């Protein structure tokens, strides 16, 4: 039993292991990063099922709300971010980098203080069930950027070899434990934005020199010392020219994360110090010496020596001949020869080398006339910069050394030519003859081209008869055209078959002989100038035609005339005729007559070879095209290629080519005489009848060219367009238009040719829908030789209007005379009746009119688009009651007409409400009968009739007070305005009286007060007098 339990436990463990448990891991915190700098947080998921690429969601819990989730960014949902982070996510300041399907990095490019908090990485469940962890958290603390690096901005001028000391001050106030690293850089002038590292102190306090300063650091010439806690000093014992540039230091602050990795959190650079270094003086002198006397044919070695410079200077030398640079050797021994001397060095004729650090050599193995002149050398001291290039410190020039050959007495030589001026492609023959006694001679021919100053070896023959051709000849094919032969012991002939323009120049024949008992032989030279004229320089091609405008089906001629000054050479040539169709931008080949007689046709005009004749004579080609077609309108030109005389046998390429001027050929139609009857007519028919419409041709072009007849129709409805009924083309094939393709339309309309000048359109069983305008279009066609039709002219006939004649019986309207009176503002009524009950298959419409002195007649549309109701001249349509009960009013009808109705199928009533004086006049009605015809049924106007005129008189009503007032505008205005004016005057009067009464009241009160005072005084006086009197008694 225990064994079974163990097995079960093991099975469950394996099952759990195979299924796996999801686990999300995030970079361990807390993490400390500085404000303004980036941060990257890693998150991975393992043990998951589902797709290999998992989605990640990042959120933050801020210290101010530690339980509130703020969504930042997601790999799945673009709208996951909260508004506070959405803008930074959209601007890519915050983004997710996927390392693998199950691993990502959250990047924040520029941290803000508000970014501090607890970050959560969450992975949505893709497993069959929830098992494991789906999120992980870490803390991020954003600390202020307190790092600073300072160094005064200054410009220092130093001499080479002097010491240099620069100090960089750094401070930081980060609360957490951090390390500093510091690096000194040099930014050289012209080095772009790339700085060179001098020396650095790592965060682990390890000194490391830059690659360019490793040797000097090991030697102790470059040092980095830490002075106290914040100062770092760069010391250079002996400055070198390569140290010139901008010097600065960079401080970097590092912090160790919980996973024990060091991460950069801040970095600062100081201002730059401009360092100018004056190279030390290194004076030396340069001299030039020769190893032997400069005899012709002998070797010559020139040595350039720099003297007076101690140490191991880096020197480069430059050789000059007559002030022109010929060779240069740099400090590393790399040789650079100019083009003329590069060829001689490759042939082993000279050698330039650097014998030692201060010695340069120029060796010429066989001195010739071209080596005569003044030689000098220039030595420059250089130093390699940090970028690897050479910097020149100083230059010194040697005195000139004159090289002049001592020529031995030589025999005379004469050079002649059969023709000193030949055409390109002709044979150039030169003879070189030496005078004197018979001797074994060798000869070499040299050519100095017209645009060069250095001779080029053409051919040579040794004393044993061995011929050597120049290696500088332009290609093996051209070398085969050169031949050098010996006519006799003293005469040598150079023959250049099929000469080229590049063969022009000055030819020099050098005759050499070896003297007995002498190491060097004698050489005699002579020159001759030869010109090879270009064939293209005088080649002219003209294209001419007497008929730039050609009538259709006529013949035109083109002549390609070649003009050249070498026509007597009778060189073979080919002619290519080209054609650019009208409206095209490219030329196409019509025909090419090769110089060997081969004819090649183009494919632009398929029938051109059937009607073209080409004749060619010496320097002239003629093209004759019969039966011109319209597609042959365009621009023509011819191209001429001139070949060598023997090119037929050798199949060589053309020497030159030239293209003629452009010539426009226009193929025009012959003048057409087509004329068609353009008069218009009207046909009035009964419904279901048949008719014919004529298309008469008055005149035609000569030859009775084929015609095509096209019939068109336009209905009477507004804005109706013309529709094609049928077309009988120039081959008498009839085609119906798109709207007339039905079998019924093809039976109803058909064309008939009565004669050469008369065509008919037959219309059977005319219906209401057939009403409208008909005309024909006549096209005259011309058949070209390539079996294509060309339209010559198109004419259009006049219009034929087709109307339906009313077919019903006459409508009899009651003719009873009626004269009536109506009171103004009262009502009036009119009646209109038919005599009889009318047809049961008919419906009736009525139109009411009123006669008026000079009123303009108006028209109103009725039942359908093909019928109109027109008011008689001098009358006005008031209202129209259609057969289907719809009402249409005239211009004034809708203003007062209130009621128009049908009292019975054949009785009609018109009532006027609130009659006015201007309504007096003559009234009458017109009744129209309508019947339904065809399938589907359409209502057709059958007949109409008018009633007797009815006279209406309008009597004025007796005036009342209110009517008088309302009828008089001034009185009405007076009655409205006058009360307001009276009220205003009354109010003004009351106000004045009130103010006056108040003033009088005040005056009265004052008078009373004065009177009372006077009365009191009077009483006192009287009492006093009475007392006195009583005293007397």
From Swiss-Prot:
Known glycosylation sites: 139, 677
Residue spans, topological domain Cytoplasmic: 992-1033
Effect on the protein upon substituting residue 175 to A: In strain: NOD/MrkTac
Residue ranges crossing the lipid bilayer per the database entry: 971-991
UniProt xrefs under Pfam families: ig (PF00047), V-set (PF07686)
Location of this chain's protein in the cell: Membrane
Primary role: Plays a role as inhibitor of T-cells proliferation induced by CD3. Inhibits expression of IL2RA on activated T-cells and secretion of IL2. Inhibits tyrosine kinases that are required for IL2 production and cellular proliferation. Inhibits phospholipase C-gamma-1/PLCG1 phosphorylation and subsequent CD3-induced changes in intracellular free calcium. Prevents nuclear translocation of nuclear factor of activated T-cell to the nucleus. Plays a role in the inhibition of T-cell proliferation via IL10 secretion by cutaneous dendritic cells.
Matches recorded under PANTHER family: IMMUNOGLOBULIN SUPERFAMILY MEMBER 2, V-SET AND TRANSMEMBRANE DOMAIN-CONTAINING PROTEIN
Protein name (Swiss-Prot/TrEMBL): Immunoglobulin superfamily member 2
Naturally occurring in which organism (per UniProt): Mus musculus (Mouse)
Species lineage: Eukaryota, Metazoa, Chordata, Craniata, Vertebrata
């Amino acid at each position: 039993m225990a064994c079974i339990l163990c097995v079960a436990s093991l099975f469950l463990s394996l099952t759990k292991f195979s299924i796996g448990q999801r686990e999300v891991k995030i970079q361990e915190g807390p993490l400390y990063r500085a404000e303004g700098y980036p941060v990257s947080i890693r998150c991975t998921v393992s043990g998951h099922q589902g797709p290999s690429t998992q989605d990640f969601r990042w959120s933050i819990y801020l210290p101010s709300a530690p339980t509130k989730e703020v969504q930042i960014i997601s790999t799945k949902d673009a709208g996951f971010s909260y508004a506070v982070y959405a803008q930074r996510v959209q601007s890519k300041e915050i983004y997710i980098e996927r390392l693998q399907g199950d691993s990502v990095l959250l990047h924040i490019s520029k941290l803000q203080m508000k970014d501090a908090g607890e970050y959560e990485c969450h992975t949505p469940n893709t497993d069959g069930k929830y098992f494991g962890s789906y999120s992980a958290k870490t803390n991020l603390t954003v600390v202020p950027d307190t790092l600073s690096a300072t160094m005064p901005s200054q410009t220092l001028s130093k001499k080479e070899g002097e010491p240099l000391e620069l100090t960089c001050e750094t401070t930081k106030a980060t609360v957490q434990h951090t390390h500093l690293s510091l690096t000194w850089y040099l930014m050289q002038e012209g080095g772009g934005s790339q700085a060179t590292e001098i020396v650095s102190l790592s965060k682990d306090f390890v000194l490391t020199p830059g690659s360019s300063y490793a040797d000097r650091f090991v030697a102790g010439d470059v040092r980095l010392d830490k002075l106290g806690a914040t100062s770092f000093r760069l010391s250079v014992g002996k400055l070198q020219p390569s140290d010139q540039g901008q010097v600065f230091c960079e401080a970097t602050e590092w912090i160790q994360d919980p996973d024990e990795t060091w991460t950069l959190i801040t970095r600062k650079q100081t201002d730059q110090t401009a360092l100018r270094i004056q190279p030390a003086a290194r004076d030396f002198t340069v001299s030039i010496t020769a190893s032997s006397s400069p005899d012709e044919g002998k070797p010559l070695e020139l040595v350039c020596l720099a003297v007076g410079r101690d140490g191991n200077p880096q020197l480069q030398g430059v050789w000059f001949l007559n002030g022109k640079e010929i060779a240069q050797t740099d400090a590393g021994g790399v040789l650079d020869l100019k083009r003329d001397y590069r060829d001689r060095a490759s042939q082993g004729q000279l050698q330039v080398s650097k014998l030692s650090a201060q010695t340069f050599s120029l060796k010429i193995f066989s001195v010739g006339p071209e080596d005569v002149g003044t030689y000098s050398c220039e030595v420059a001291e250089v130093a390699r910069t940090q970028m690897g290039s050479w910097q020149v410190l100083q230059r010194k020039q040697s005195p000139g050394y004159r090289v002049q050959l001592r020529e031995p007495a030589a025999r005379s030589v004469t050079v002649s030519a059969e023709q000193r001026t030949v055409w390109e492609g002709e044979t150039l023959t030169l003879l070189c003859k030496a005078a004197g006694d018979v001797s074994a001679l060798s000869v070499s021919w040299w050519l100095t081209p017209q645009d060069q100053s250095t001779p080029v070896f053409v051919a040579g023959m040794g004393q044993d008869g061995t011929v050597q051709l120049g290696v500088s000849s332009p290609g093996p094919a051209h070398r085969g055209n050169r031949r050098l032969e010996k006519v006799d012991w003293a005469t040598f002939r150079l023959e250049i078959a099929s000469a080229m323009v590049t063969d022009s120049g000055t030819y020099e024949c050098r005759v050499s002989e070896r003297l007995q008992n002498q190491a060097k032989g004698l050489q005699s030279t002579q020159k001759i100038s030869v010109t090879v004229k270009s064939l293209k320089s005088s080649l002219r091609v003209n294209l001419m035609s007497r008929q730039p405008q050609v009538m259709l089906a006529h013949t035109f001629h083109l002549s390609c005339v070649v003009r050249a000054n070498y026509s007597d050479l009778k060189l073979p040539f080919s002619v290519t005729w080209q054609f650019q169709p009208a409206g095209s931008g490219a030329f196409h080949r019509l025909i090419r007559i090769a110089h060997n007689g081969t004819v090649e046709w183009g494919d632009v005009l398929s029938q051109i070879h059937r009607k073209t004749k080409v004749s060619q004579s010496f320097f002239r080609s003629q093209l004759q095209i019969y039966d011109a077609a319209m597609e042959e309108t365009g621009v023509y030109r011819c191209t001429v290629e001139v070949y060598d005389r023997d090119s037929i046998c050798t199949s060589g390429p053309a020497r030159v080519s030239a293209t003629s001027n452009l010539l426009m050929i226009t193929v025009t139609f012959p003048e057409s005489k087509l004329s068609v009857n353009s008069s218009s007519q009207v046909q009035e028919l009964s419904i279901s009848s048949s008719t014919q419409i004529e298309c008469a041709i008055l005149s035609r072009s000569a030859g009775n060219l084929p015609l095509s007849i096209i019939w068109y129709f336009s209905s009477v409805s507004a804005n109706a367009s013309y529709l094609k009924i049928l077309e009988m083309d120039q081959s008498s094939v009839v085609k119906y238009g798109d709207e007339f393709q039905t079998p019924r339309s093809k039976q109803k309309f058909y064309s008939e040719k009565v004669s050469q000048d008369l065509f008919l359109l037959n219309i059977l069983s005319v219906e209401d829908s057939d009403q409208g305008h008909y005309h024909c279009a006549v096209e005259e066609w011309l058949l070209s030789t390539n079996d294509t039709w060309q339209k010559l002219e198109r004419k259009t006939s006049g219009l034929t209007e087709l109307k339906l004649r009313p077919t019903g019986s006459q409508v009899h309207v009651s003719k009873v005379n009626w004269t009536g009176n109506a009171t103004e503002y009262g009502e009036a009524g009119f009646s209109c009746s038919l005599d009889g009950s009318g047809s049961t298959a008919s419906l009736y419409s009525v139109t009411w009119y009123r006669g008026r002195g000079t009123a303009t007649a108006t028209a109103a549309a009725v039942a359908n688009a093909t019928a109109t109701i027109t008011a008689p001249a001098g009358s006005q349509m008031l209202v129209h009651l259609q057969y289907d009960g719809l009402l249409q009013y005239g211009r004034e009808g809708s203003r007062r007409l209130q009621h128009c109705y049908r009292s019975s199928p054949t009785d009609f009533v018109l009532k006027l409400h609130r009659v006015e004086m201007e309504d007096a006049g003559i009234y009458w009605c017109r009744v129209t009968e309508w019947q339904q015809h065809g399938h589907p049924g359409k209502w057709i106007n059958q007949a109409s009739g008018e009633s007797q005129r009815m006279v209406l008189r309008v009597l004025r009503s007796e005036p009342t007070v209110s009517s008088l007032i309302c009828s008089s505008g001034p009185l009405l205005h007076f009655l409205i305005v006058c009360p307001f004016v009276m009220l205003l005057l009354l109010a003004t009067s009351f106000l004045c009286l009130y103010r006056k009464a108040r003033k009088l009241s005040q005056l009265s009160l004052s008078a009373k007060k004065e009177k009372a005072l006077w009365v009191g005084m009077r009483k006192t006086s009287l009492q006093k007098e009475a007392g006195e009197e009583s005293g007397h008694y």
